[in-house]
């Protein structure tokens, strides 16, 4: 038997219970009405404002209910409700008041009828949601332009649209003691590893939190190594990529109110792949993948290597290149380490400003800001032209990494390479590579 307070046949008791818990919630409406012959049966409709359209309340569900039950006696009314004589596709009887409350707060219409010991959940449009649109974070030249929205129902439908097979299972979970956020696991029953699926379920069930408002909260609470700056779950806003990974035997975790899906389990190379790799020829996709891996290495290693070479190991460079470096640094009052750190932090400010600026200006601030700051710093002899080139190449390389969370991790560890490369040379860079923190 379901835990909770059962719905009773006494409508007044049910109404008092719901009104006491909805006190102070002006957006929750409790609408009394009369059904049956001569209005002999009392009923109560409970819903959240703007989640149930007027069409449902006046012309569709309740309107049809008034017409269908106008000449029926109380017993016939109960039988009609029990048998769902209106043919509502999403009508479901609920045993307890808590189930009814959760269903109503999820955006459904809850109907209580005098003499009927169950609540009737009637599906509606739910909460207002953004329509399906392009994704700004994972742009591609070839492939679908659809992106996930904040509605888990819509996101599930976008995946089902691409995998029209009953072997694709959609499993619902709930997270958040107060938020009661709906989670969905999407997987192919014949392809997924049962051990992986069970581990994901345990990871979700093991934490207790008031509210889950985004998939990023689940990502942080379920990751195994919280010390590492690198992401342990691949994320995507593209339903075509999610469908591809489901067909590969992975599990897609969707979170209500979040357009970002988690792809489980994940390995490092997943973060370097893009959707277009599946659509392009093997030779082209392989070449582009090599470029991305090279950009990944440059993004965190280039600046530190530059400092190590010009500060400690100039003998490995040709004489002409050494002279060029020395000439570019004439008149610069700061050591190479400080000028590189200055430019790196300046680029971080430009990047952050570009993200926070309005859309019409965000694209301009990065280009114009970089040109102005770089040219002004060189003209004022604060930094050398070579340092600007190195830092710009490092920043450009980071933009080529497909996964933003992975990019942020490389941007963070880059400063460790800069400090050790500038202070200890190649020995410092080697120290980072051979060191591995051990957790006990």
Predicted regions and their residues:
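Short polybasic/polar patches that bind polyanions
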Residues: 164, 205, 351, 378, ...
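Aromatic/hydrophobic pocket-lining residues that form π-stacking "cages" and hydrophobic walls in ligand
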Residues: 373, 433-434
């Amino acid at each position: 038997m379901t835990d909770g307070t059962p719905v009773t046949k006494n409508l007044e008791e049910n109404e008092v219970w719901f009104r006491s818990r909805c006190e102070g919630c002006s957006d929750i409406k409790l609408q009394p009405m009369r059904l049956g012959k001569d209005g002999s049966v009392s009923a109560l409709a409970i819903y959240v404002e703007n989640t149930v359209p007027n069409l449902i309340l006046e012309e569709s569900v309740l309107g049809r209910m008034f017409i269908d039950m106008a000449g029926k006696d109380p017993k016939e009314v109960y039988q009609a409700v029990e048998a769902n004589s209106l043919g509502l596709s999403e009508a479901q009887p609920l045993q307890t008041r808590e189930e009814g409350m959760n269903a109503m707060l999820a955006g459904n219409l809850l109907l209580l009828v005098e003499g009927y010991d169950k609540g009737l959940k009637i599906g509606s449009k739910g909460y207002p949601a953004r329509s399906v649109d392009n994704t700004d974070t994972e742009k591609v030249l070839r492939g679908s332009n659809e992106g996930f929205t904040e509605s888990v129902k819509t996101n599930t439908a976008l995946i089902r649209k691409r995998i029209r097979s009953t072997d694709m299972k959609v499993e619902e979970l709930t997270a958040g003691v107060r938020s009661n956020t709906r989670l969905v696991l999407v997987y192919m029953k014949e392809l997924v590893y049962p051990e992986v699926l069970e581990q994901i379920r345990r990871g979700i069930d093991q934490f207790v939190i008031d509210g889950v408002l985004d998939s990023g909260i689940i990502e942080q609470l379920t990751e195994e190594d919280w010390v590492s700056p690198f992401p342990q779950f691949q994320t995507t806003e593209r339903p075509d990529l999610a469908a591809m990974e489901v067909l590969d035997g992975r599990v897609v975790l969707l979170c209500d109110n979040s357009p970002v899906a988690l792809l489980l389990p994940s390995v490092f190379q997943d973060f370097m792949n893009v959707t277009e790799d599946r659509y392009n020829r093997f030779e082209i996709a392989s070449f582009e993948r090599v470029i991305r891996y090279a950009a990944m290495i440059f993004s965190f290693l280039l600046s530190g290597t530059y400092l190590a070479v010009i500060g400690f190991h100039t003998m490995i460079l040709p004489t002409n290149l050494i002279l060029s470096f020395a000439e570019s640094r004439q008149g610069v009052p700061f050591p190479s380490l400080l000028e590189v750190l200055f430019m790196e932090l300046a680029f971080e400010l430009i990047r952050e400003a570009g993200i926070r600026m309005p859309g019409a200006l965000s694209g301009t601030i990065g280009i114009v800001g970089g040109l102005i700051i770089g040219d002004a710093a060189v003209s004022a002899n604060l930094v050398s032209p070579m340092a600007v080139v190195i830092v710009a190449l490092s920043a450009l390389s980071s933009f080529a990494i497909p996964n933003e969370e992975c990019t942020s991790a490389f941007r963070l560890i880059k400063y460790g390479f800069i400090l050790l490369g500038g202070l200890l040379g190649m020995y410092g860079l080697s120290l980072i590579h051979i060191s591995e923190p051990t957790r006990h």
